[in-house]
Structure formats: structure tokens, C-alpha cells
């Protein structure tokens, strides 16, 4: 089986190490694994798995868009289109998503492909970003606006920090973008995050 993981980093930090640990275990079981990543260096022993999405310059431009326009996840359109072209050629059996924030991938372009691909999709959520209009860790300020619709984000100055607040628009866009994938399983590393995910508008009932 061919398995493709997508994460902001590969082989470093918590989520990057989770991906490479999974890749090593899956490879030992006879599967073929690739990890598409967006930024930073990959340790030598994990380069056999690594597929770079876009360029370092693209990450910087995406970061500027996020800072100026609260556009985290909505930059990197050209890079993501090129990556989707590569995915079609690679033709994985399973696509395992991890952190999609980090200024490296366009969620609209990615999910347009996932919705029409017919692929089995697994998404491991490592934080709250997927179901909020801005924040990655909404629980830090005990905010529950995300459950019905974000607005006036109390964490707009926190990662992914922005000069303006488009949390209301982002929340609505994410709800639309993340709906409609026919075969998608959501995984969380904790009961706490699972509880939040189940009642979120983006993943209600999954």
C-alpha cells in the first residue's frame, strides 16, 4: 500500500517525529511511505520519505499574507497546485493529513482535490486550528466561539498572528472547505481534543 502523509515539517518537532515514527513502522510492515512537508530541514535518515511542498520563499510570502490579512492556510496556491499534480502521479492509496497550518499549503486547493480523488483520507488533528477561524489553541483563553461561529478572536495576536481579524470569514470558509470528503476519518491524540472536534461545525458527528 502507498501511504502519503502531509505535515508542516518532517522528522523534527512533535508532529514531524510522529510522522517519521509512523513511516518507519509502516515501512517495516511492507508499505511504501512518503511525507510531504512544507518547511525546515529534514534529518538525513528521513530524507528517503521527504517530498517538499513549494519553496522557502513561498512559505515567507504565505506568512506575510497571514500576518497582513489573517490568511493562514489560504496562501501557497501555486505551490499546492504543483503538489496536487505530483499527488495525482504518485497515486497514493491513503492520504494522512497532519498539521496543515504553518504557511505552506492552500487548504482550498488541497481539499478540492481530496473531494474528487476518491482516496481514503485520515486527518490527525494535533490542535484546534482546523475548526476555529484563527486560533490553534482556543482553550488557552477558554474561548468557545468556534462551536457556532468565530468573531472578534481574542487570540488574533497569537500564532498565526495577524494585524486584522478575519476569524468570522475564515471559520465559514473552513466549514465549507472541510465538508464533502466522502471517506475521511478524524483522529485526535487526546479525549479533550476529541470532545471539541465532535461538537465543532466543521466535523460534527465524525
Name the predicted role of every residue range:
Residues 1-206:
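Catalytic cores of nucleotide-sugar-dependent glycosyltransferases that transfer UDP/GDP/TDP-activated
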